Amino acid sequence: MAAFKLADRLATLPPYLFAGIDKVKAEVAARGVDIISLGIGDPDMATPGFIIEAMKEAIARPANHQYPSYVGMLAFRQEVANWYDRRFGVSLDPATEVIGLIGSKEGIAHFPFAFINPGDLVLVCTPNYPVYHIATGFAGGEVQFVPLLEENDFLPDLDAIPEDTWKRAKMIFVNYPNNPTAATAPLGFYEKLVDICRRFDVIIAHDTAYTEIYYDEDNRPPSILSVPGAKDVAIEFHSLSKTYNMTGWRVGMAVGNPTLVAGLGKIKENMDSGIFQAVQEASIVALRDGDDFCRELRGIYRQRRDTVINALHKAGIQCRVPQATFYVWARVPQGHTSADFVTRVLQETGVVVTPGNGFGTPGEGFFRISLTVDNARLEEAVSRIAKL
């Protein structure tokens, strides 16, 4: 058999974050241990029935089985614009400022190819969703990580970035509400970031997949596009995955600066063939009619969050109370590294949590819990961890 060599861009990739965890998980499961997985952020609850019914109706229409538009149906893009106006007070032109995505991950992964040339500098706030820096590397860009530290409320210290770096930078990736830290960003942070990036002509790529999983109705996570002038420099990636329990449906959107949206569209027209049209029609119903469901979903996650936080605090494990996302970002006990601790937890208790350093160097000393099992299983999981 021929020995084919992987391209350098793949050969130099570190192992996928969850690959090593899955290997240990399989070994533990083979011993007959009851596994409770709080690792990957994949909702355990079903897509709501009204969306499923809309999908059933859409599937029955023959026209929906043809090639879709690579930018998304105009009706879908219009509903995205309607939702942004209702939720954030942001006005969008569905023809030029909205594009449909086969999940936000696809759009984020493709975006650097539209604007990053080999050697261009891209700032990536870390700990982070790995796709930001991996996609940048695939496009030939140079990555400079910007640390998110607890003493700064897991926000980047924009003033600590030298002016020369801002002058060189072509793009910055930010993500709030944040995965993995669960931090949120106030509007003032976005105002400062937009001001700097307008001054130095830096593209802002903002990942907002978790804006609808929040716990304070009086302090809802904003869109960066709420900031005057943000459209000059920003594109925002959003998804229906977490908002409506639709991770497997693969549907999302990117909105903002029309040049940035068009550039992403140019990549997509050459790389994919768009979102299955029946999924888009069901997504229109989700965006239009899903507010009550989202309110109920937040209530469930709030209960789960409180269960985990109370149990962790009783066990002496330090963590902040998250104001958004379905993650808890907790400190590992003294004397452990992140990797050592989560491996011990998995091997001795059967509970899967994620090591913080898997999201970047500043994540060392932390681990992430996903609130993606029911309350009883969460109580059992944290009880097992507390006995270590």
UniProtKB/Swiss-Prot annotation:
Its EC number is 2.6.1.83. It comes from the Bacteria. Pathway: Amino-acid biosynthesis; L-lysine biosynthesis via DAP pathway; LL-2,6-diaminopimelate from (S)-tetrahydrodipicolinate (aminotransferase route): step 1/1. GO terms for molecular function: L,L-diaminopimelate aminotransferase activity; pyridoxal phosphate binding. One of its GO terms (biological process) is lysine biosynthetic process via diaminopimelate. Pyridoxal 5'-phosphate binds at Y70, S104, K105, Y129, N179, Y210, S239, L240, S241, R250. Keywords: Aminotransferase, Pyridoxal phosphate, Transferase. Coiled coil: none annotated. InterPro entries: Aminotransferase_I/II_large, DAP-NH2Trfase_DapL_Desulfo, DapL/ALD1, LL-DAP_aminotransferase, NHTrfase_class1_PyrdxlP-BS, PyrdxlP-dep_Trfase, PyrdxlP-dep_Trfase_major, PyrdxlP-dep_Trfase_small. Substrate binds at Y16, G41, K105, Y129, N179, R368. The modification N6-(pyridoxal phosphate)lysine is found at K242. It is an enzyme of class 2 (transferase). It catalyses: (2S,6S)-2,6-diaminopimelate + 2-oxoglutarate = (S)-2,3,4,5-tetrahydrodipicolinate + L-glutamate + H2O + H(+). Its cofactor is pyridoxal 5'-phosphate. Homodimer. NCBIfam families: DapC_direct, PRK09276.1. Involved in the synthesis of meso-diaminopimelate (m-DAP or DL-DAP), required for both lysine and peptidoglycan biosynthesis. Catalyzes the direct conversion of tetrahydrodipicolinate to LL-diaminopimelate. Belongs to the class-I pyridoxal-phosphate-dependent aminotransferase family. LL-diaminopimelate aminotransferase subfamily. This is LL-diaminopimelate aminotransferase.
